[in-house]
Design a protein with these regions (language model features):
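Electropositive, glycine- and tryptophan-enriched low-complexity nucleic-acid-binding patches
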Residues: 133-191
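A short, flexible helix-boundary coil/loop motif
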Residues: 11, 244-260, 330-388
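Short amphipathic alpha-helical "interface-anchor" segments enriched in bulky aromatics
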Residues: 2-3, 49, 305-340
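Active-site-proximal, Lys/Arg-enriched surface segment
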Residues: 73-156
Length: 388
């Protein structure tokens, strides 16, 4: 907390958090400040936070007693989420100014867009729940669930979450992602050069939105764009691949531009194919095993901006949001926990988790010496923060 207050002016940022209550009895800065301690300590629930209510720490940090779990939940349900986004933008700008965020490859930083299902239930629902029907042995059952789309920066050595957008009932993931992308392009216009997405986003409206704002896209190419895929595969068979070695992975890459088979997009497309052979040593048998895979991407970025080798690295970089983003946020930061089953509260707690994640990684990467970072795991460091 002291580091975050010194570098980012955390106390002042917390005082700027707004809410929709008319006559609040407890200040929003007390509610958000308590939630931030819970998130940074990776406690995982408001009830766990309430267990340490009698600690003298709260008087020093909040200047007041800790509110109850129910009060904190109601407070987050009335919180102005745009004010949390403003706080995240301020922290990002400080990191950028301090040259913490460095390009991943070819002098570029990429924005990764992907969707995630945070939780589901067959018993509880709210106004923001999506609905689906499950065919079970006991008949058809209704299941409610929540999904959101997250935007993260892919920089050298770090995947930094920036924002999220809840998917509304009756809305598909790409429409939700486009709404998120419009806001990210407005809030972080110069933060990234390139957008990475999976095969679901290989749609003309998404590509056109990115091109309209001067951003190129790399997305997986699947059977949904069969004409483009067939044209590319036919030409690839007539040419020799470029060979690359990336640690234990051998790659045969084909890279061609000026495809016009995607008529809905209305511009030329670049297609890259990578057939890969990875050398794996089995832990049990100690034998060497080879895993083969094939990847195809469609993109609007020309070769003169991004060569084939770095293109493929960015294409695989999309998985950073799965491995270093959703995986860590869910398993260590309890991002899938329902603190309060209210659409506004779920969004607010999601943004709170993003803010805590950024502050925690800024602290361990910028304030701790390398020998400490290498000696202890992130989980252990988080537990030390909680103990203090």
């Amino acid at each position: 907390m002291k580091y975050s207050d010194k570098v980012f002016g955390l106390r002042g940022l917390i005082q700027g958090i707004e809410d929709k209550r008319l006559r609040p009895q407890i200040a929003m800065e007390e509610i958000f400040g308590a939630g931030l301690v819970m998130a940074l300590g990776q406690l995982g629930s408001l009830n766990a936070l309430e267990q340490i209510k009698k600690q003298c720490y709260w008087k020093r940090w909040l200047g007041a007693d800790l509110a109850s779990a129910d009060t904190l939940g109601r407070g987050f349900s009335r919180m102005n989420t745009d004010s949390i986004r403003k706080t995240i933008r301020h922290v990002y700008s400080r990191l950028k100014r301090n040259k913490v965020l460095r390009p991943a490859y070819a002098g570029m930083i990429a924005l990764i867009i992907d969707g995630h299902e945070s939780h589901r239930s067959q018993l509880r629902c709210c106004g923001g729940c999506l609905e689906r029907r499950l065919h079970t042995k006991d008949g058809i059952r209704r299941e409610n669930y929540h999904r959101h789309v997250m935007a993260s920066l892919f920089c050298k050595g770090v995947c930094l979450p920036l924002d999220l957008e809840p998917q509304a009932p009756g809305e598909d993931e790409v429409s939700c992602a486009m709404r998120l992308l419009v806001r990210v392009l407005k809030d972080y216009p110069k933060a990234f050069n390139l957008i990475l997405a999976d095969g679901l986003y290989t749609q003309a409206p998404f590509f056109k939105l990115a091109k309209k704002h001067g951003k190129d896209v790399i997305a997986e190419l699947k059977d949904d764009r069969r004409d483009l895929l067939k044209d590319a595969q036919g030409l690839f068979k007539q040419s020799k691949p470029n060979l690359y070695q990336d640690n234990k992975v051998e790659r045969q890459c084909w890279d061609m531009e000026h495809f016009t088979s995607w008529e809905q997009l209305g511009c030329e497309v670049r297609v890259v194919c990578s057939i890969e052979r990875k050398r794996v040593k089995r832990q049990k048998t100690k034998k060497i095993h080879f895993e083969n895979s094939e990847w195809v991407w469609a993109s609007t970025i020309p070769k003169q901006k991004l060569d084939t080798e770095d293109f493929v690295k960015f294409g695989h970089g999309r998985w950073k949001i799965e491995n270093n983003g959703f995986n860590e946020l869910v398993n260590y930061w309890h991002a899938d926990h329902v603190y309060c089953h209210n659409p506004s509260a779920i969004e607010a707690f999601g943004l709170l988790t993003i803010l805590a994640y950024i502050l925690f990684h800024a602290f361990i990467n910028r304030n701790l010496k390398a020998v400490i970072r290498h000696k202890y795991t992130k989980k252990h460091l988080a537990q030390m923060i909680t103990a203090e």
